[in-house]
Amino acid sequence: MAPISSAQATPRLERVLPRADTAAEFFSPDYASARGRFRAAALRAGAALDTLPLAARGPRDEALTIDIAWLGARQPRRVLLHLSGVHGVEAFAGSAAQLALLAAPPPLPADGALVLLHVLNPYGMAWLRRANEHNVDLNRNFHVDNGIWTGAPPLYKRLDALLNPASPPSRDAFALRLAAAGWRHGVQAVRQAIAHGQHRYPRGLFYGGAELQPGPRLFIDWLQKRLGGAEALFAIDMHTGLGPHGKDTLIREPGVGSASVETLQAALDRPLSGGNAAPAAYTVRGSLGAALPGLLPQTRMEFVLQEIGTWPALRVISALRDENRWHHYGDGGLDHPSKRRLLEALCPAADDWREAAVMHGHGLVYRAACWTFGEKSA
């Protein structure tokens, strides 16, 4: 195929999908269904499939795997990589976007490949958790260069009892107490302390782990073996929860990527935050995006984290806190209000939100394909 042109970069979904008014139907009810649909769609699209099995099991004792669909050249010079499910329960939107991409992929040049990594944290998706089987936030776990697995932000230590009570979920005026902490320390300081990542409280929120986790380890091994020869890589890591409801926010990792902010914003037709662009809501330690250049040092790279906004931050952090308490101090079963609240907080049930998530996810890949495979990148 010829390289994708700018005119093809942002198609309306109804032009490339047979039933765009039902984009929400790309959403699956659970991990097992999502995995089955992804693998079937990959085979229909003529994609090659790689499967990376994990030792952890799902709630029905089902196998948990990271599945990777590969379209295009088997030894590509240019690669567009789309990842879903780094934060388990957030994978429902990323999985849906990947099904849409398999139904209507962008054109690929002879030396190009589109690679879709389906659910880096299948345990979290299967059990409706943001963290993995060891309570590790995988986007705080990629310490591949410095190997520092200790410590926590000083303010997190002061917030630990508020964030991580050693008891099942209960009414405890969390919102008022968090607001008081924001008044005392500053809202931005509290947000940064909570979300930055910590390695001191293994049962706490945003725990980065004490070692590299099985999912990231499998991913890194696969990445270096399969994509180590690529000259150029554009990676998109799709998440949910941050930003205005149903809108997408694009975040650039500090120090990753050679294109200017203005050039990349023009190519993607979206403003960027983070890096040299506008400030991000918070910075994190041990992110996947920050690790990528060191994993593929010979590859020219661009990376964007795409967030699809859901609900206000207080609702999201409250849902994360309740589910975490249920996991550690209840029985952790799926049939509990805390699980349903977390799913709604990070994957709203409304069709209009789900259609917007698919449109944003699918559209960004098309625009990134124009950048990656266009004549200027050849």
Language-model features: locations:
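Structured catalytic-domain cores with a bias toward divalent-metal coordination
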Residues: 2-378
